[in-house]
């Protein structure tokens, strides 16, 4: 693990995530493999659907899930965005959580209440689409995806505890709220979508 996200204790995060992978890699790879094969099977079945030859164009983005909307594109957030890891990267499994500065201050003051939410830093739809395209472009090479891609991209599944007011607009005049679908994964790795709404960096690691 080579952490690229701006956090205040990179070594700690690298060590914890490496330990998580080393201790659970067979279970993680087995489950990820099943998720990959599921979306591959559905996509390929849509190519030659016996009931409606237009279903691929209408609901599977005509093969271009990066640029075209569609039910399958949206669906990818479930098996690959939310649920690709059988053991989520939460405090129970990796021994830490990420907080924005404002969220951390509430935690220290013990005033969290219902003011915080967990934000999927990279966006579950974006991550789901990215994984599917990587898998497809690899020639459906599940071994590469499980043995090489997954351990080198675990940070795509990180969440961060932020204020609800940082997470989404409270009304039409609110200038806060993390932008959705406006940044590349590379920009999100630098947390540009957080910086734009005034969330200070680095994120705070709490064990």
Indicate where each model-derived feature is located.
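Short, well-structured alpha-helical interface segments that form or flank functional binding sites
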Residues: 67-70, 113-116, 154-161
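Histidine-centered nuclease catalytic patch
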Residues: 110-152
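A structural signal for short, well-ordered beta-strand segments and their strand-loop junctions
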Residues: 117-118, 159-164, 202-205
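Hydrophobic/aromatic-lined pockets within catalytic cores
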Residues: 126, 164-171, 195, 199
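"Short basic amphipathic alpha-helical interaction patches in structured regions
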Residues: 132-141, 175-185
